[in-house]
């Protein structure tokens, strides 16, 4: 549904960007995504490499980044783009991958796993993300202009490991149905976070085992 992404990610984003321009807001942080890299052949993906989105969602995020870059250039705005890599954690959207997994494993519902579970993701715990954003907001002076960061742990985890981790915590087995690879899906995400660590001095990323346990305990899924 390309129109849905255009209405939300492009038109909605443009409305906010215009408000930032008109109100002369000092710092504008916006959400981008690891999907801008598409199925990269080079890992870990760096902020400076060529972007090749594989789906409409990723394409809209590239458009937003370029829009922010031009607004920064022509209207002297300070825009900071955050390329989030598979953020998960307590109180997450129920339609996202990990919350759906937790719910379906708990109630023994059928889980559709694409590409035989061979996907790999750079999972980033939500509390880490909150701390990073706080540090970035506090750090940057008014002269930042436009800058982009990979917001990622820098660690790659196989989807099957996530499933096994949830099974272990909940002490339940999953009901898996393996399906073929979906169009536009990325086989792997793995970001380089050197720039992020340098500018925030944040290095204590939550590992997937701890993140899953905290998510389940805080959401009282057991």
Regions found by a protein language model. Give the residues of each.
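Active-site helix of classical SDR
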Residues: 56-63
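NAD(P)-dependent short-chain dehydrogenase/reductase
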Residues: 43, 54, 66-137, 163-169
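Active-site Tyr-X3-Lys motif and surrounding loop/helix of classical short-chain dehydrogenase/reductase
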Residues: 1-7, 52
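C-terminal substrate-binding subdomain of Rossmann-fold SDR/epimerase-dehydratase oxidoreductases
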Residues: 105-222
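Structural signature of beta-strand start/N-cap positions in the alpha/beta core
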Residues: 26-27, 78-80, 147
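Conserved Rossmann-fold NAD(P)-dependent oxidoreductase catalytic core, especially the SDR/UDP-sugar
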Residues: 14-56
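Structural element of the ATP-grasp superfamily
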Residues: 16, 68, 101, 196-197
């Amino acid at each position: 549904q390309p129109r849905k992404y255009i209405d939300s990610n492009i038109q909605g984003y443009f409305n906010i960007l215009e408000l930032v321009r008109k109100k002369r807001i000092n710092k504008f942080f916006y959400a981008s995504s690891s999907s801008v890299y598409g199925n990269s052949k080079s890992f870990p993906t760096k902020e400076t490499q060529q972007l090749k989105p594989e789906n409409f969602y990723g394409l809209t995020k590239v458009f937003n980044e370029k829009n922010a870059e031009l607004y920064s250039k022509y209207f002297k705005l300070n825009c900071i783009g955050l390329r989030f890599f598979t953020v998960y954690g307590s109180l997450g959207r129920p339609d996202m991958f990990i919350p759906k997994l937790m719910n379906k494993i708990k109630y023994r519902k059928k889980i559709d796993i694409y590409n035989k579970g061979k996907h790999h993701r750079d999972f980033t715990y939500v509390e880490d993300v909150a701390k990073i954003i706080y540090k970035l907001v506090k750090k940057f002076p008014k002269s930042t202009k436009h800058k982009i960061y990979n917001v990622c742990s820098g660690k790659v985890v196989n989807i099957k490991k996530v499933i096994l981790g949830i099974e272990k915590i909940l002490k339940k087995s999953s009901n898996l149905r393996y399906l073929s690879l979906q169009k536009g899906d990325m086989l792997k995400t793995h970001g380089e976070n050197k720039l992020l660590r340098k500018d925030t001095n944040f290095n204590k990323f939550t590992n997937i085992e701890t993140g899953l346990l905290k998510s389940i305990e805080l959401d009282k899924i057991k």
